[in-house]
Amino acid sequence: MSESEYRSSISVRPTFNRTMQSTATYGSTISSGTSRTLKITEIGGSNLTSGMSPFGGHAASAIRESRTREKKEMSELNDRLASYIEKVRFLEAQNRKMEKDLNLLRGKWGHDSTSVKVMYETELRSAKDLIADSDKERAQLEDQIKKLVEELNNYRNKLHEAERGADVTRKELDNVLGRLGALEAEIELLKRRISLMEESIGHLKRENHRMIDSLHHARNAVEQETLNRIDYQNQVQTLLEECDFIRRIHDSEIHDLLAMASRDTTVENREYFKNELSSAIREIRSEYDHVSNTTRTDIESWYKLKVQEIHTQNSRNCLEQNYAREEVKRLRTTLGDMRGKMADLEGRNLLLEKQIEDLNYQMEEDMRSYEQSLNDKDTSINKLRDESKILMVELQMLIDTKQTLDAEIVIYRKMLDGEENRAGLRQLVEQVVKTTSIHQTKEIESLRVLKGETTSHSSYSRSAKGNIAIQEAEPSGKYIVLENISRRDENIGDWKLRRKIAGKREIVFTFPREFTLRAQKSVKIFARGQGVHSPPDSLVYDLEDSFGTGNDVVTTLYNKEGEDRASHSQRASHT
């Protein structure tokens, strides 16, 4: 066979696209203890990753599938090889019949060796050229992979910067929302104070109207007493005139008696009648003076007493009116200040709401741009990953081609070395079988339990129908605080405090008899061993170590008549 007639059978393997499927499967189940089960499937084997750790898993998946197909092809080739070996054995049996032809071939040994050498050198040059081209392509692919990795790192850095910016914006928004909540709470407090002041103003107005009515009644009483005084003065004048009339009558009678006495010539009779008349006159005068003095004294005393009462009532009414005027003036001033402050706070609240709207709009824009950049980066990353997978597959194919070529070169060398004996073909078959690579795949399942997070949500609500309110009910059941929101003391003796917990018994605390809660003060009721008994600021309930805890707790205050006066409810949920 001449050199020009020989053609090398070594060629570049045709490229083909392999479909890749991830071998890592994740399954999650939610257990009763709010835990999550994560199933991880790992792939192990002897696949070559060429040091590409970021894409090792995906490349291994592609190579595993290609190895599966190659294993199937290798099985078919093994079957073909087995049939070929049987054919070789048949040919070896025929070789015994072809010794004559072999002797002829041995006579032409030198010429045939030269032809085989030419064939070997031609194949070797082709293989070297192909290896050189493969090395060049591999270097180019490695450079491209480095550039892609650098670009991927840049995208990752930009992504981290965008995430940090989003975190900063989120923190600023949380701070603004916190300030807004504080301002809203302050506004609600001011509205509550204004409502309380308006109630106080209404109470003072009602008190003022009551005092004005009392003043009118007092004035009417003064006028009535004045009329009575005039009437009594008229009665006194009438009595005085009657006394004068009686005195004149008595004087006339005395004058008549004197005239009669003067007619009597007896000295003893004149003296007797004179003495009797003088005695009668003295008795009448003394009785008249006594009656007159008694009447005058009684009238003057009664008049002075009534005048003093009227003056006292008038002074008290004047003081109360002055106090009410001062209180109304002070409340109006405070109300004006509160309204001014409330207007300032409302303006500030509007400004903050405008800032929040601007920040929300800016945050939405940033989030949209951030999501768009994330989508673009994800698309770029997926594209780079696909390209990297393709490059890894092509690189693995080139490596496989190189290994196959190296194995074929070694086989040809051994074939030439073993041409002198009859076992050369058998060695060829054995080398082909020995160079077949076997890939094993094993699956490892690992069960990992991730403890879930627990979120607690609590809500409180309270109400009051009078001046006594339940200010606080400690969640762990250590104490309960009652508050007197009025400006006067409240007697809450024999009142009952009931605490109902879902699924548990009811706890009842009764206040001591004649217990008074002072104005604008509070009293704390401790469970046994949780505080100090110091009335009227604190009381201790000796019958219970705790007022109880639960997810649904209602605390209610009842007066002596069993009426609901205040309540406090607490509800908690856990997710």
From Swiss-Prot:
The record, for InterPro entries, names: IF_conserved, IF_rod_dom, Intermed_filament_ifa/ifb, Lamin_tail_dom, Lamin_tail_dom_sf
Region (Linker 1), start-end ranges: 106-119
Q: Where is this region: Head?
A: 1-73
Q: Where is the LTD domain?
A: 456-572
Q: Which GO terms describe its cellular component?
A: cytoplasm; intermediate filament; nuclear envelope; nuclear lamina
Where is this protein found?
Cytoplasm
Residue ranges, annotated region (Linker 12): 258-275
- The record's region (Tail) falls at 424-572
Signal peptide from the UniProt entry:
none
Q: Name one GO biological process term.
A: protein localization to nuclear envelope
In alphabetical order, the GO MF annotations are: structural constituent of cytoskeleton
- Tell me the keywords, alphabetical order: Coiled coil, Cytoplasm, Intermediate filament
Q: Does the keyword Cytoplasm apply?
A: yes
Supply the SMART domains for this chain: Filament
Q: Where is this region: Coil 1B?
A: 120-257
* Coil 2: region residues: 276-423
Its predominant location is: cytoplasm
**Residue ranges annotated for the IF rod domain, each copy included:** 70-423
For the region Coil 1A, give the residue spans: 74-105
Instruction: Name the organs or tissues of expression.
Output: Expressed in the larva in the pharyngeal-intestinal valve, the rectum and some neurons of the tail. Highly expressed in the intestine of the newly formed dauer larva. Colocalizes with ifb-1. Not expressed in the intestine of normal developmental stages.
**Family named by the database record:** Belongs to the intermediate filament family.
Query: What is this protein's function per UniProt?
Result: Cytoplasmic intermediate filaments provide mechanical strength to cells. Non-essential protein.
Subunit record text: Probably forms some heteromeric filaments with ifb-1.
Q: What is the protein's name according to its record?
A: Intermediate filament protein ifa-4
* Species in which this protein is naturally found: Caenorhabditis elegans
Q: What is the lineage of its organism?
A: Eukaryota, Metazoa, Ecdysozoa, Nematoda, Chromadorea
- Gene that encodes it: ifa-4
